[in-house]
Design a protein with these regions (language model features):
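N-terminal secretory signal peptides and thylakoid transit peptides that target proteins
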Residues: 1-18
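C-terminal segment of N-terminal export signals and the immediately downstream linker at the start
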Residues: 24-51, 55-56
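Mid-length scaffold segments of soluble, non-membrane domains
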Residues: 66-95
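Short metal-coordination and nucleic-acid-contact micro-motifs, chiefly zinc-binding Cys/His arrays
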Residues: 69, 114-117, 140
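Short cysteine-rich clusters marking metal-coordination/redox-active sites
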Residues: 73, 121-124
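Short Cys/His-rich local motifs and their 1-3 flanking residues in nucleic-acid-associated proteins
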Residues: 78, 123-126
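Short Fe-S-cluster ligation motifs
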Residues: 102-119
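Short linker/helix segments within small regulatory modules
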Residues: 110, 134-139
Length: 140
């Protein structure tokens, strides 16, 4: 099929396509609904949850947490992980072999020139981290 485009229209379409491609991940990131701001969140928690920040490794209070029970979203209180799913990945971040069913929604994160899976609380939409294939071999 042949299109009869003048030079100006072609350049406009090319520009729209080019810039839309680079802006698309940022638009999608802003489209995630984030709600129920817990007034007791720390500055660090807000940066991670609402700006997709990352805490420094080996700084989380949850890294050495050993109590039985559940890990909850600090923003809305939704249950996210069972303590039985926690393992030491050696990365310096709390790691889990699996989340509770329906606890998260995921999206692809292309920041820093990498393709990663980012996960957000299914209830309030805040960012909680990334999914990596670093779990114990028996969990797949």
């Amino acid at each position: 099929m042949k299109y009869n485009l003048d030079k100006r229209t072609f350049i406009k379409l090319l520009g729209i396509t080019f810039f839309s491609f680079f802006l698309m991940p940022f638009k999608f990131a802003k489209a995630v609904t984030k709600k129920v701001v817990n007034e007791n969140l720390t500055k660090k928690q807000k940066e991670i949850m609402f700006n997709e920040g990352t805490e420094r490794p080996f700084t989380s209070d949850l890294l050495n947490e050993k109590r039985e029970g559940f890990y909850h979203c600090a923003n809305c209180g939704a249950k996210l992980f069972a303590s039985t799913a926690k393992f030491d990945s050696g990365t310096g971040w709390p790691s889990f072999t699996e989340a509770l069913p329906g606890a998260f929604k995921t999206k692809i994160d292309y920041s820093f020139g990498m393709k990663r899976i980012e996960y957000h609380c299914a209830n309030c939409g805040v960012h909680h981290g990334h999914v990596f294939a670093d779990g114990p071999s028996e969990t797949g």
